[in-house]
Each structure stands twice: as structure tokens, then as C-alpha cells.
């Protein structure tokens, strides 16, 4: 009860940085109200939420179908035959929803949205999980992505050395600038959120260190 009263007071005085409605800021720091920049991958470990798509992006981009079209514009698509192996991961974005399972997982498509993700499942490549910040305490509408570069299936899809930083940077390189898919043209800009999460490997899945940075993308439909 005491914690709830404290939270209510902070909200009333605007001290949490977490208004209740969308369209105010691009995202809210998950840690402000008890969230984390690591998702829950099991065994007390997590993977970094190392890319954020701004809640001030074009609204269509932030929908499930709009995100998929944008993902295909930058080289990702649905999993092979829409089959997901393994348990979903969850994230707490500090929005009052607690730990929520990933919305979707998308994989590098190697130039073919229909079959390329099957190749990624075999030989490895880039992929990301999506979490939406939309709870009543911090409803930015932003999409938090856990991006990583993984090994082939013969290595159990483990993350490659430095795979969180490398996966993030590869996605951003593909996204920034003008991209087009299905007749929709996007312009994406990027900003580095330096030191937004702890540096190092403490609590990080596979014991792979991260540099502490996330990339903040704003995506506009032209």
C-alpha cells in the first residue's frame, strides 16, 4: 500500500516522467517505475533492449502490421513458416503492465521475406524480439527491441561473441535513411542513448558484455 501511495504521489506531481497518455515523448525509461533494460530470458538472466522505436514515429509504424512492413523494408520478416521454437521472453517496461511476453520475433530474411528466415534459422543471422510500452503508467507507445546476432542451428542459436552490440548496429545500419516496401517509403533517423543501461555482462544472457548504449529510432512515413 505504501508503495502504491508513493507512486500515486509521484504521478500527481509529475516526478516519474511517466504521464498516462501517448504522444508526449518518444519513450519512458523503464527503470523509472521498476522496469528493466534487460528482458527475462530465464534463469535470472536477460537480453538487452538495445533499440527503441520512438512512440512519436508515424502511428502506422507502431501497429503490428505496420511494424512488420517496416521490418521487411529493413531486411527482417516473420519466422520460418510462422513457427516459433522455444519459450517466449518477457520484458518489464515500467509502464504498469509488469512482465509481458514478446509481441513478435522477427528474423533476418536474406532478401526473401517468404523464405529467407528459414535460411536464418539454419545458418544464423540477426533477429529481434518486440515489446510495446503501453501501460497506464507510461504509455509512450514506443517499441523496445531486443536485437542480437545468433549462431547457426548447429550451435543451438547461441549468441555470437559481442552479438548484442553487433546485432543492434547491423539493424540500425539497415534502417537509417530512406527505405521502401510494399509501396510505403520510410525515413529513419537514429540517436544513441549513451549509457542508458549498465555496461558489462552482469545479468546478461550467455555472459556476453554490452556497451551500455541503446539506439533510439524515429521512423516517419514519407
Predicted segments with their positions:
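Universal eukaryotic N-terminal targeting presequences
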Residues: 1-4, 8, 14-19
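Mature extracellular/extracytoplasmic regions of secreted and cell-surface glycoproteins
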Residues: 15-208
